[in-house]
Design a protein with these regions (language model features):
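Conserved catalytic core of the tyrosine transesterase superfamily
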Residues: 1-304
């Protein structure tokens, strides 16, 4: 029997079982769970209609590797979806079938041999020197010492918002001519050490001098004293972006700013280590030449 949502009751139950398992086993936010459910529903809807199954009911044991390959091809050719959307849905399927194997619902994962589609990586927009100065000035003019220090730390270490929120005072080590901070909550919980330059050390020393000694977090919420949430951090950065009249930038662009500036003089493998990248491919986005760079290079050999 088909639900009003467009897929069978069996399909709906499949989604519910998977999402319930993720809810129990992993700490995922509601938005991520909703995306997983939507992606799986898209596949099941295609399976029960476009793939021409006689009884129109989804059964996981009926899904083979060629089935998923046909789905990938359909998303590319007839649906004309963007590579990023196709890959996100394929990754969801891979996660679903991996879970199904772990729960003994199937013996083999049919999605394993299926490759993702090529995706052209676009380098993030670069924040300029002028924009960085305007952002810092906006915080100095109307922000607290905590907010000013947060911006300096993010611009000079490239930390992710989650990593900034999780910092504790004990994660900071400052000497006379060097310093470092320890990131304990990076992606996949990988710990790493990030060096602190003179600007960062001076800002942190000034800020930590007035920070309550019993504070469990380096940058606690000014309202509650508890952990500053990532949402609150993004909001405060956006506030200063707006005050500085900067458009098209977000909190993550502070990390990109660090990556671009460092890439000019830092070997790729060292930059990847500092930024906590698992793959050098991720770090490569900071060394790809812009159109202006390429134009400048070819102009050098022009006949005058």
């Amino acid at each position: 029997m088909r639900e009003s949502t467009g897929i069978s009751e069996q399909g709906e139950q499949t989604i519910q079982d998977f999402i319930q398992a993720l809810t129990i086993q992993e700490d995922l936010n509601p938005k991520t769970l909703k995306e997983y459910a939507s992606d799986l529903k898209h596949f099941i809807g295609w399976f029960e209609t476009a793939d021409h199954h006689e009884d129109d009911i989804f059964r996981i044991e009926d899904v083979a590797t060629p089935t998923i390959t046909r789905y990938r091809d359909a998303m590319q050719k007839s649906m004309k979806l963007k590579p990023s959307t196709i890959n996100r849905r394929l990754i969801t399927l891979k996660r679903y079938f991996d879970w199904a194997v772990s729960e003994s619902k199937i013996r083999r994962d049919p999605s394993k041999p299926v490759k993702l589609v090529p995706e052209e990586k676009v380098s993030p927009r670069q924040m300029t020197d002028k924009e960085e100065a305007a952002l810092v000035a906006a915080a100095e003019h109307g922000g607290s010492l905590r907010d000013q220090t947060i911006l300096i730390v993010m611009l000079h270490t490239g930390l992710r918002t989650m990593e900034v929120c999780d910092l504790a005072p004990g994660d900071i080590q400052i000497g006379k001519r060097s310093g470092q901070l320890t990131v304990r909550s990076g992606k996949r919980n990988k710990q790493r050490e990030v060096p602190l330059n003179a600007t960062c050390r001076a800002a942190l020393e000034r800020y930590m001098y007035v920070l309550p000694p019993d504070s469990p977090y380096l940058f606690p919420s000014e309202k509650t004293g508890d952990r500053l949430t990532e949402r609150a951090l993004r909001h405060l950065i956006q506030k200063y972006m707006k005050a500085a009249r900067l458009e098209g930038l977000s909190a993550h662009d502070l990390r990109h700013r660090f990556g671009y500036v460092m890439a000019e003089n830092t070997p790729l493998h060292r930059l990847a280590q500092i930024m906590g990248h698992d793959s050098l491919d991720t770090t490569m986005i900071y060394v790809r030449a812009t159109r202006a760079d390429l134009q400048s290079e070819v102009e050098k050999i022009a006949w005058q």
